[in-house]
C-alpha cells in the first residue's frame, strides 16, 4: 500500500476537494459544519476527515533556537496548566510531559497527554535553566550557554514551571 507524503501547506490548500489521510486527523478537536455534510464527508471515503481551516501552527509544533549565548525551546501547551506539566533534565535531554485527565470542553469530554524530548547542547549551563508558562499557553524553556568546557551535570532533575501573566510575544529572528 502506497502512502502519499504531502507537505502540510499543500494538503490544506483545496480543503474538502482533496481529503486528508487518516493519520492527519485532529483527534480531540471539535467538528466543523462541513464535517457533518454527507456529500462532502462520507461520499469520498468514510475514513477521511477534511482539515479545512486548520492552522499548521496549532498542531503542536515547537520552536527550538540555539543562539550564540542562549538555548531556547518554545512549545504551545495552551490546553495544559502548570500543574499538568512536568519538565525534567535527564542527562543531556530536556523532557517535557503534559497530561490532564478527562474534562469537559465545548465539544464533549477530552483528555490529553504528550511527551517531547529535546537534546541540550553541551554548552548549556544546566544548573541555570528556567521554564516559564505564559498567559497565552506558550511554554518557554531557556538556558544560557557557557563558553568554557565545564563538566555538565548528568542527573535526573525536575525544572519548576513558573507562570507568567503576560502573553508571549514571538521573538524576532
From Swiss-Prot:
Biological-process GO terms, alphabetical: lens development in camera-type eye; negative regulation of apoptotic process; protein refolding; response to heat
Sequence ranges of Basic and acidic residues compositional bias: 153-167
Keywords, comma-separated and alphabetical: Acetylation, Cytoplasm, Eye lens protein, Metal-binding, Nucleus, Zinc
Residues noted as binding Zn(2+) 2 in the record, renumbered to the chain: 107
One annotated Gene Ontology cellular component of this protein: cytoplasm
Record: residues binding Zn(2+) 1: 100, 102
Stated name of the protein: Alpha-crystallin A chain
Organism field: Alligator mississippiensis
Lineage: Eukaryota, Metazoa, Chordata, Craniata, Vertebrata
Gene designation: CRYAA
Amino acid at each position: 500500500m502506497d502512502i502519499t507524503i504531502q507537505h502540510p501547506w499543500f494538503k490544506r490548500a483545496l480543503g474538502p476537494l482533496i481529503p486528508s489521510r487518516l493519520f492527519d486527523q485532529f483527534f480531540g478537536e471539535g467538528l466543523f459544519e462541513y464535517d457533518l455534510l454527507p456529500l462532502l464527508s462520507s461520499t469520498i471515503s468514510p475514513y477521511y476527515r477534511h482539515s479545512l481551516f486548520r492552522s499548521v501552527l496549532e498542531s503542536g509544533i515547537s520552536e527550538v533556537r540555539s543562539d550564540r549565548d542562549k538555548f531556547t525551546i518554545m512549545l504551545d501547551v495552551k490546553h495544559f496548566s502548570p500543574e499538568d506539566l512536568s519538565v525534567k533534565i535527564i542527562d543531556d535531554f530536556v523532557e517535557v510531559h503534559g497530561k490532564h485527565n478527562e474534562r469537559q470542553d465545548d465539544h464533549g469530554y477530552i483528555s490529553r497527554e504528550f511527551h517531547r524530548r529535546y537534546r541540550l547542547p553541551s554548552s548549556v549551563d544546566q544548573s541555570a535553566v528556567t521554564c516559564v508558562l505564559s498567559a497565552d499557553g506558550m511554554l518557554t524553556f531557556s538556558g544560557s550557554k557557557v563558553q568554557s568546557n565545564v563538566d555538565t551535570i548528568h542527573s535526573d532533575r525536575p525544572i519548576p514551571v513558573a507562570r507568567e501573566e503576560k502573553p508571549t510575544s514571538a521573538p524576532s529572528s
